[in-house]
Amino acid sequence: MASSLLEPSLAAIALVILLASVSLSRKKRPAAPEPQGLSVLGNLFDIPKRASSIIYLALGKPYNTLTKRAVSQLQGYTPGSHIDATSHSPRVFRLPNLEETFSVFPDHGLNPNYTSARTDSRAWINQYTKVVCGPKMVAFMNNCEFELSNSHCYPYAGYKGLKATMDLTNILWLYDEYTDTGSGAEAVKAAGIVARALREPDYDDGTWVCRMMKSFKQNHIDKAGPGVARRFIDNFCNYVEVVGREAELREKNEVLDIPNYVTFRRETSAVRTCFDLVEYCLDLDLPQYVHDDPVFISGYNAGMDLVFWANDLVSYNMEQSKGHSGANVVTVIMKSKGVDLQTAVDFLGGYCEALTAQLLEAKRILQARSDAAYSRDVVRLMDAFGDWVRGNVAWSFETERYFGKENKRVKETLLVELKEPFVGALALKE
């Protein structure tokens, strides 16, 4: 297909999508034809004049209005022309209506295995939380109902698969809290322990991190297909390595530019590992040529980016109150481009609409192929990515993780009142 499939009015958003379509695989991709021109959105993201596989994808007609809205939100934008984020401190901002945007993905409800899997997963993770966390932090994490997110995001999984996803989610939250409070050196050391625990059968240094990861691998990853197991271990080891780098950036109070943050966030979000378990839960083990396919990559990246962009939006208030907002795309856009908070949030809402179109279009193209690995198996996977995207946002308004007792009010009004820094924040050992 040629780039002429893109309507001229959508060329701008295609360039934004381009940023989301690169770097999944560390292998170089064949160059694609160069699209015509740059736009206000291309300028915002400093996107070079080159194209990726998504340039081949036509955005579906129902999304024309949505993607044009993303462009119109920043029409007339000139870098530095808005209020500098460092000198402007609004107390309230409005979230984009992500539930409306993601309503194009079917609502498959909650997983019927939720209650039994939750009980067993919580008993398993509590072996490690009681070592790391104080009683108040344990109570807070229990109230966050992390396991409920898996019931939303994996509605099709059997008990075995759902328990695996809950165990992983509990690992990720515990590891995140642990590394958030430690130094960069401590995070790097923990990453080394994780890598050896996953890759060396006889390694055991006696730490809670080592025991936790070896137990998870034996319970779940050793039972997955060889491709899924290999990708999960590689992706998890890369995740903990980059989390160590995140801790070092936090110590230096360093904020990345937008392109580097995109690449960085794809790893620190750990969404790749969650998507590995999508294959596991669906009893799939896709061949590597599927994972290397450019159209598959564009759909995969769209789903992955939608998960962590949405997370950055809903978690911004919590993170800025803890002094961790530097590792959030809202701050990255504000700092890099000198725009105010609401402008950055509005842009991200439009960006999520464009990525939604990208995911659906990738699925449409792959479904038309004769190879059943695409037309049957990948379609199931892309549908499950939609469950993840929609379920992640639904859970974000049910948990107290991001908005505390105000979660239902925020869901209804979309208005978020900024917390004062460090007010109500819990220490890990508290």
Swiss-Prot record:
Motif (DDXXD motif): 176-180
Annotated glycosylation sites: N113
Signal peptide: 1-25
Enzyme type, top EC level: lyase
Binding site for Mg(2+) 1: D176
GO molecular function per UniProt: metal ion binding; terpene synthase activity
UniProt-listed Pfam families: Terpene_syn_C_2
Enzyme Commission number(s): 4.2.3.-, 4.2.3.88
UniProt-annotated binding residues for (2E,6E)-farnesyl diphosphate: R401, Y402
Biological processes per GO annotation: isoprenoid biosynthetic process
Annotated Mg(2+) 2 binding sites: D176
InterPro entries for the chain: Isoprenoid_synthase_dom_sf, Terpene_cyclase-like_2
Chain residues that bind Mg(2+) 3: N311, S315, E319
Name used for this protein in its record: Sesquiterpene synthase Agr5
Species this protein is from: Cyclocybe aegerita
Designated gene of the protein: Agr5
